[in-house]
Structure formats: structure tokens, C-alpha cells
């Protein structure tokens, strides 16, 4: 498994490069969403938009309405915080925006094309190619190295045979990203050998390896101490500035939200500001 993912178990030292010189995974993003991709659009400032989202969870005869008529826009190249207390519905909203779940009412568009009503397979393709996602918990595979964890999304996105043909390029991309997040000395370490902050930095590199247009972050500092959390936040903001990457971040922390370009407040399933 290890050799399949990265082609080598030897330690390597990535070439030093500036953050803006990171090798991009070469993709033709001009195809329509039917194939899992969405064409880039310069006509609108909004890369992602949701209208009148409602989500109800049902268990037997009981219903809990988690979101009620929520409108949301993510501005291209900006960092938007979704701020709210536990139970306000902010993580549910992020999961809907990331096509991990579907709304009971309302619609979501990405680059002007609707995505919430796509068949599951096409939603998965869209998410794999267009989005990067990080969570409070890191979800690194414990059996493989940090480098292999970062490379893994490319195997899933490209399919085994296409991945094997371009594995060297994907490895170089993963090494450069790990260098960018300060983990060039941890390429061959497994998750159990990393600190919490290092695991989250590895998760950020993994989320970026496919060159997503949009990064969704669900409480990315929630499992870290304040100092480490501030380091992770600073890293995300630097990546936003360097790459122009659009970021939507869920948080309950006012100080984190204050550093974002825009703040959306959510209370009891409704956007209030």
C-alpha cells in the first residue's frame, strides 16, 4: 500500500520553492459540471451561493429543524467565517455547502451552476475536484505516512491507472505543500508521531493537493490549544493571500472570526447578520 501511494518509502528532501511556485496539478477545468467539473466564471463575485436552505433531521416521529431559510454567499478570493454557538446549525450549513448532505428545501449553486440536486456520484466527483475540506478532527489514515496521506486524494480523484502514470508529479506537489506548511521534516512520519498542530497542518496540505477552488474548514482550530490554533489560522490566512483561495470557515470563536474578511452569524438555524 505504501509503495502504491508514493512510489517509494525512502526519505526525501523537497526542493525549496516559494509559496507562489507550488506545482499545480494539471487539470482541464473547462468542462461542464455533468462530468464533475464546473467551468470557471468571471461574471460574478460569488463563487458559492445558497438560497433559502432548510434542513430537518427526522428520527421516528420526531423532527428537528436545524436550518430555516438560510441565504449564504461566499465571495471569490475572500475568507468568510460562519460564527455561532454549539447547536446553531453552522456545521450542518457547511456540510450542505460541501455536498456532504442535501437540503430539504432551497438550492446551492457553484460558479452559477446548481450542485445540490446532482446525483450522488456527480456530487462526489464535484467535491473531489473542486473543494478542499478540513475538520476539527484530522482524519489522517494511521497506517501510512504523512506524505502518503497528502497524496491519497489524488489517487481517489484520478483513478488508479491515471494516478500511477502521474505519481511522480503528485508526489512533488505533496512534498511542496508539506514544505509550505512546515512539515518537510515529517514526510515519513505516521500520524501517531505528530503533534495535534502538525496533524492539522498535514490535513491542510491534503486538502490543497488537488488545487481546489474553495476550501471549507469546520472548526479547524477547535481541537487545538489557543497558541497552536492561532498558528493554524495564520497559515490559512497566508494561503488565502498567496493563492487567492476562497475559504469558508466555521467557528464559535469571535477572535478567529475577527480576522476573516466577512462574518456570517448563525443563531438557532437562522442567519442573523
Predicted stretch roles:
Residues 1-56, 273:
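ABC-family P-loop ATPase nucleotide-binding domain
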Residues 46-267:
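ABC family nucleotide-binding domain
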Residues 267, 272-273:
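Short beta-strand in the C-terminal region of the ABC ATPase nucleotide-binding domain
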